């Protein structure tokens, strides 16, 4: 049996941010795909079920895609340079469970990914340190 792969879809206007997120997610074992907008996710339910969506999109875009967002709310990670209590409450009401302030800290992204459950058959490699690598501060003890 061939194990399914984890996919990560990145939506962000900033090329540097997309590159940074792509490198982080590849390091965490994801096959990364950069997409232009939310509409490109339609018909990709199977891929998303076995992966995640990391996006910096306007709240109006999310409001226009509530039906899609509700299907993937547990695997949708919103990134934003401005995270206020008011915005967080509004997003939570829409079903967004994971919000990360930009610039994205790799340790926080990894922590959020660890909270996401992946379906059977989806290969989920360890997110721990690599052999011979230096441990993160939280891993030293």
What residue spans do the PLM features occupy?
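Conserved acidic carboxylate
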Residues: 11-12
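C-terminal output helix
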Residues: 20, 86, 104-113
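Alpha4 helix (beta4-alpha4-beta5 surface) of REC/receiver domains from two-component response regulators
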Residues: 80-98
């Amino acid at each position: 049996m061939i194990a399914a792969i984890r996919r990560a879809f990145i939506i962000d206007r900033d090329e540097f941010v997309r590159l940074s997120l792509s490198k982080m997610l590849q390091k965490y074992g994801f096959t990364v795909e950069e997409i232009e907008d939310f509409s490109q996710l339609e018909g990709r339910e199977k891929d998303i079920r076995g992966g995640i969506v990391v996006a910096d999109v306007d709240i109006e875009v999310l409001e226009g895609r509530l039906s899609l967002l509700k299907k993937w709310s547990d695997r949708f990670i919103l990134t934003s340079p401005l995270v206020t209590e008011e915005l967080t409450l509004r997003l939570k009401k829409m079903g967004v469970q994971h919000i990360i302030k930009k610039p994205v800290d790799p340790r926080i992204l990894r922590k959020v990914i660890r909270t996401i459950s992946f379906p059977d058959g989806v290969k989920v490699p360890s997110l721990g340190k690599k052999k011979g690598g230096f441990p993160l501060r939280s891993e030293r003890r």
